[in-house]
Amino acid sequence: MKEQLLTKKILNWYDLNKRSLPWRKNVSLQKRQYYTLVSEFMLQQTQVATVIPFFNRFIKNIPTLKLLAKVQNKKLLKLWEGLGYYSRAKNLKKTAQTVTKNFKGKIPNNYEDLLSLPGVGNYTASAILAIAFNKPYIPLDGNIERVLKRYLYLKKEKDIQKDNLIKKKSIFGTSSRSSDYAQALMELGALICKPTNPLCNQCPISKNCKSLQKKDFNLTKNNKKNIDKYFLLKVYKKDQRYLLIKNT
């Protein structure tokens, strides 16, 4: 019952406050699936505000998955220019080609097949299933993680490990509006439960937020040590251009 109430509050807030984003347009199911695929690739490691103009330009020039599968690399990379992480663009095209060849041009609507696509990991697969196919998945991005950590007041390092957060997110429950609900949770983290200075007075679920009750909004960082790796590189220069090659 509590989960249903939580879901209702978040969706009611979303209906009134959601941002108007180009990939949220009321379009055909096929277009929505394509828009979701493109936007999720672009949003990997890039903020929403930065992505919007690139997404609009990309869709204007490559409006369908079929065209994406056949686009010349030069044109593709030109459209991606300025967005960075060009491997995303290359993987996006490879994904379009794989979908065209192996799935009859239709983006798969199950987790295992999505994970088989180039550049699609656990998060992207969950996001596509929720947003494009209205399936009951909650993709655990940085925004939703933050809401979860604060709402449950997760402070211990073992509590904020990814595996534990995946289990804890069940507190959010499910909705028949899975597409909207996944985006609502993302919006809540992006617009209200910000990394600093969260807008608790505007939060639809603040009443039961443990961090608000304790007046402690600091987030415990995952202190899992990263391993530094070092490589020797060969540098070649020609006509003011540089080429770096890993020395194996």
Task: List the model feature ranges, each with a label.
Residues 2-4, 13-199, 205-208, 213-214:
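Catalytic cores of DNA base-excision repair glycosylases
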Residues 10:
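Non-catalytic nucleic-acid substrate-recognition regions in nucleic-acid-modifying enzymes
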Residues 213-248:
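N-terminal strand-loop-strand
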